[in-house]
């Protein structure tokens, strides 16, 4: 099962949290969900060059709080905060509630699966050899402290007539272990030969390490032995 399902979705509530946190009545749930999808599409389109890793949406008391995780926060903020103000106005038109935007910097983009996948996709679009792009990404990720990395690319690799899948892995990637902190993301490279899909798994360690076995209690002296 761990080899087939999305590693992030399988670990929600265990080692991962939801990216949308809010409560809605049954009649309003679909509208709220559709608003979230529209906001995410808007942000991904507007912030295409800002290396956005993750977008969190919260709705506390008739307000909206959006947390954008990015490796290039300066691009989002803009000169004197002009870009973020324009972004807030656009999101307000979608959500119809006051919006508060927070930018959090991703300090190690090499350990973020989304940023690694997008970086590989950009290299493939620039016609870099896929094996070189995969190997370089794996080495950079392991150098930053990851315990294991797996990268898979699928499509007409190198302009081949028949599409195929190639993958490269170093270290451990225990997909069946629920306590394993595994980041997973996908990206698409639009090449002249067609679309090439990129998948990245990064194993950062175990979140809930098993507790060491309790030491056996020393035998207590009996009254007869004391006498």
From Swiss-Prot:
Pfam families, A to Z: KH_2 (PF07650), Ribosomal_S3_C (PF00189)
GO cellular component term of the entry, any: cytosolic small ribosomal subunit
Any one Gene Ontology BP term: translation
N-terminal signal peptide: none
InterPro entries: KH_dom, KH_dom-like_a/b, KH_dom_type_2, KH_sf_prok-type, Ribosomal_S3_C_sf, Ribosomal_uS3_bac-typ, Ribosomal_uS3_C, Ribosomal_uS3_CS
Domain KH type-2 per the UniProt entry, residue ranges: 39-107
Any one GO MF annotation of this record: mRNA binding
Superkingdom, natural source: Bacteria
Subunit structure: Part of the 30S ribosomal subunit. Forms a tight complex with proteins S10 and S14.
Family: Belongs to the universal ribosomal protein uS3 family.
Xref: HAMAP family: Ribosomal_uS3_B
Protein name: Small ribosomal subunit protein uS3
Protein species of origin: Coxiella burnetii (strain RSA 493 / Nine Mile phase I)
């Amino acid at each position: 099962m761990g080899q087939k399902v999305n590693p992030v979705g399988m670990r929600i509530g265990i080692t991962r949290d939801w990216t949308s946190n809010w409560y809605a009545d049954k009649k309003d749930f679909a509208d709220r969900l559709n608003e979230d999808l529209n906001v995410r599409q808007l942000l991904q389109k507007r912030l295409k060059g800002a290396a956005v890793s993750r977008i969190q949406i919260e709705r506390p008391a008739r307000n909206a709080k959006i947390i954008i995780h990015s490796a290039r926060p300066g691009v989002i903020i803009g000169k004197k905060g002009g870009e973020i103000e324009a972004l807030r106005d656009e999101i307000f038109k979608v959500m119809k509630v006051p919006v508060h935007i927070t930018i959090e910097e991703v300090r190690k983009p090499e350990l973020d699966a989304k940023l690694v996948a997008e970086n590989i996709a950009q290299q493939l679009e620039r016609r870099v050899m896929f094996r070189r792009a995969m190997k370089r990404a794996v080495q950079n990720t392991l150098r930053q402290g990851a315990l294991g990395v797996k990268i898979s690319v699928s499509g007409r690799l190198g302009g081949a007539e028949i599409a195929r899948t190639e993958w490269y892995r170093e270290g451990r990637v225990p997909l069946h272990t629920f306590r394993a902190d595994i980041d997973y993301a996908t990206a698409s490279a639009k090449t002249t030969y067609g679309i090439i899909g990129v998948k990245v798994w990064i194993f950062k360690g175990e979140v809930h390490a098993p507790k060491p076995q309790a030491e056996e209690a020393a035998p207590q002296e009996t009254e007869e032995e004391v006498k």
